[in-house]
Each structure stands twice: as C-alpha cells, then as structure tokens.
C-alpha cells in the first residue's frame, strides 16, 4: 500500500475502472465533469446533443449523485433513452446502478449497488457457508446493495428489487433462504420481472 503496509494474500484482484475520453470536448461548450453531464433524458447542456454509455455522467439510481457507470447494461439503457428522446418520444432515465459480474478462478461473483455503506441506518444481512457468500444491504426497507459469491443464480431477483426500489418487509425473513424466488414476492411485484 502507499503507506508501506503489506497485506498477505493468496490472490489480489485490482481494477482501476474506466475514465471517459472527453478532454477533446472541453472547449466545445458542453458541460464536462468526469464525463459528459446529461439530464434525465440523456441530453447534454447543449440542446439536441445527447450522450450515453461510457462517456455519460448520469445520476446514481440510489444516491442521486452524478457518476459515470461504465458498464454495458447501463450503456444499453442510456442509449435507448437517448434514442427515444432524439426521436421525439419523451422518456426519462431512472439513474445508473453500478454492478459487476466476474468469474475468478471457478467462483462467480456479482455485486451491485452500495455494498459498503457508510450510513449507520443501513442493515447488513450476510449468509455464508464454505462455498457461498451472500450479502444484502438494506435501507428504508429497500435493498441498496448486493454481493453474491459462488451461487449467483438468483442474484437478478435481488438486483431487480433494488432497481425498482421495492420494499422487502413482506418477505424479509425469506430473503436469503435457499429456496427464495419469484414465488415469494407479492403478486403486484412480479410485473416488474
């Protein structure tokens, strides 16, 4: 580490992320921060100029803060919204949700949302065994963070609950049970899946 401290490990995974290539636009009149700043319609500060994907700086779905979330699913969603708005159909983008899915060795890993909250009002639920690790971060009765290592099969359910900001109180006790699935969700929630 910078401090000179050493941390022994069998494996270290380091990722530096993505930095949008936007320097060439700085004198264009388009508002640039870390990326091209866009509104909820993916429109830049210059009327009729839209941005999406790795160069777009959007609102974070959960915090509302501006950020660049350079991942394929968000690029697709942003591109759709930008395209609809360019064609005259008014559609707003709900915000970006950071997430990753990787395989390290033979272990699958999915993380999404706010996985290491600094807010004391968050509840963290962890269920683990020798092969699997599952962590949910809950705030105000909604999932705001997910980490699954090993068995990631149903992680999409949790990520969609988070994306839709659906309260989990009605099925809270079953959240990390092995047989948890769509059947455990209230009927009115299932339309979101």
Residue positions per predicted region:
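Secondary-structure transition/turn motif
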Residues: 1-5, 149
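Mid-to-C-terminal Rossmann-like scaffold of FAD/NAD(P)H-dependent oxidoreductases
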Residues: 55-154
């Amino acid at each position: 580490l910078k401090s000179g401290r050493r941390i022994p490990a069998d494996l270290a995974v380091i990722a530096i992320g993505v930095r949008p290539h936007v320097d060439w636009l700085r004198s264009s009149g388009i508002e640039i921060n870390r990326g091209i700043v866009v509104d909820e319609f993916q429109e830049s500060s210059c009327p009729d100029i839209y941005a999406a994907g790795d160069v777009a700086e959007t609102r974070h779905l959960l915090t509302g803060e501006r950020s660049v979330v350079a991942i394929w699913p968000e690029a697709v969603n942003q591109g759709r919204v930008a395209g609809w708005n360019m064609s005259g159909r008014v559609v707003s983008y709900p915000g970006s949700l950071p997430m990753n899915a990787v395989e390290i060795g033979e272990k699958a890993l999915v993380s999404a949302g706010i996985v290491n909250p600094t807010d004391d009002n968050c509840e963290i639920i962890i269920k683990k065994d020798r092969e699997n690790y599952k962590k949910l971060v809950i705030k105000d009765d909604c999932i705001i963070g997910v980490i699954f290592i090993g068995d990631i099969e149903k992680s999409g359910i949790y990520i969609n609950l988070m994306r839709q900001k659906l309260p989990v109180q009605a099925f809270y006790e079953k959240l990390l049970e092995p047989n948890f699935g769509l059947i455990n969700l209230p009927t009115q929630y299932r339309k979101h899946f």
